[in-house]
Amino acid sequence: MKPIEILKELIKFRSLTPSDDGAFNYVSMLLADFSEDRFELNGVTNAIFTKRLGLGPHLCFAGHIDVVPPGEGWASDPFMPVEADGFLYGRGAQDMKSGIAAAICALAAARDFKGTLSLLLTSDEEGDGIYGTREMLSKLREQGALPDFAVVAEPTCEVRFGDTIKIGRRGSINGVLTLTGIGGHAAYPDKCINPVHILAPVLASLAGHDLDAGSEDFAPAKIVITDIRGGSQVVNVTPKDVCVMFNVRGGVGLGLEDVRDYVLGSFELDAKDALCSESESCGKLEMSCTAQLRAGASLHLALKSSSKPFLTQRNSKIVQKLSASVQKICGAAAELNTAGGTSDARYFAEFGVETAEFGVRNDTIHQINERVEISDVENLAKIFSDLIENFG
C-alpha cells in the first residue's frame, strides 16, 4: 500500500465541505481490519477507525477529508490527480489528503504497537466546523474511548519538509466595534455627532496594538483591523455610524475581558462604564457591551471567541516522540511553534488529549493548482510508521 496511490484516489472524491463524497467508504475498505464508528449530524460525516493491539496507550491520527472549492483557473481538473515533475496536483493534495493518506498507510502496516491505534476523520473542518471533530470527541468521551495522544496531520511545514511541528495554536477573537452618532449636513458639523471624528484619534491606539508581550511559545497578541466602514459615500453628508472589524490572535491566558478592557480604555472608559453580557454557543464565548461616550455618541462592542488557544508542553511524550521520528527520517530537527491559523487540534486539547500537528508543506494550500511533492508524502508515511513503532 503506497501513500501516493492512496492520495490519488482521495483527491478524486469531490469532498467539498461538508461532504465526504464517499471518501469514508474508501478509507473503510483500506482499513478493513479496523473497527469503524461512523457518526452523521446535520449533513456532516465523522468517523473513527480503531484497532486495539494491546493494553498500552491510545494513539490517534486525525484529519479532515473536506476541501475548499477549487475556484477557476486550474491547469487541469482539480479532482483528477496529475503527476508531473515530482509533484502531485489536485485539490486537497496538501490540505490535507496527503496527511490522511500517510496515516492510513502507516496504520495499515502497524503490527507491533502495544496499545490502541485509531484514525479520526471529519468532513466539517473547512466550513463552520460545528458538527465535526468536537462532536466526535464528545461522543468518544461519553463512551470512555478518548485517545491519550493525537497527531493531527495538517500541512505544518514551511520551507522544507520536516521543518515545523505545531505544538499549539493561538486562539482567535473576532471583534466588531460600532460608534453611533447623529448624521447630518457636512456644512453644519455643529448640528451633528460625527462618529468618524470620534474614532479617528483612537484608531492609532487600536491598530496593530500588542495586548501582551507574548511568550516563548506565543507571539504577542495583536489587534489587527480587518475592515472599517461608515457613511453613505456622499461627500456632503456626515455618517450616522462607523463600524470597525478586527481580529486578535492570542496565546493561553488571553480572554474576551482583556480585549474588552483595552478597547474601552482607548475611549477613556472601563468595564463599569459599560453594560456587558456574556453567552456561550457550541463552546464559543461571546460578549456584548454598550456604553455612552462623553462626545454624545454610543458605543457597541461585540466580541466572539471563534477558537480557543492550546499548548502542548515541549517535554510531552507526543512532542518528544514525533520530534525524534522527524529527525530520524529527515535528518534535521523540526522547529516547535504555534504560528498560523486555527485547526481541529484545539478540540483534542480541549478534551485533555496531548496533541501535536505535523504534515507536508503548506505553500499551495487553498490555491489554484495546489500540489504536493511526492517524496514529502512518502517520507510523511515513514515518519508516522516510525512514530508508531517507537511510541511504546
Task: Give residue spans per PLM region.
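Active-site metal-coordination/substrate-binding segment of hydrolases
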Residues: 59-121, 376
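Acidic-glycine-rich active-site phosphate/pyrophosphate-binding loop
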Residues: 68-84, 151, 168-178, 356
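Phosphate-handling active-site elements
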Residues: 84-86, 106-119, 142-146, 206-215, ...
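Short, low-order "capping/linker" segments at domain edges
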Residues: 311-325
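Midchain, well-structured core segments that form catalytic/ion-binding scaffolds
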Residues: 139-270, 284-289, 293-302, 307
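Zn-dependent metallopeptidase/amidohydrolase metal-coordination segment
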Residues: 277, 302, 306, 323-392
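Acidic/histidine-rich catalytic neighborhood of metal-dependent amide-processing enzymes
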Residues: 100-168
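N-terminal helical capping/dimerization or prosegment-like subdomains
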Residues: 1-71, 241-247, 259-262, 321, ...
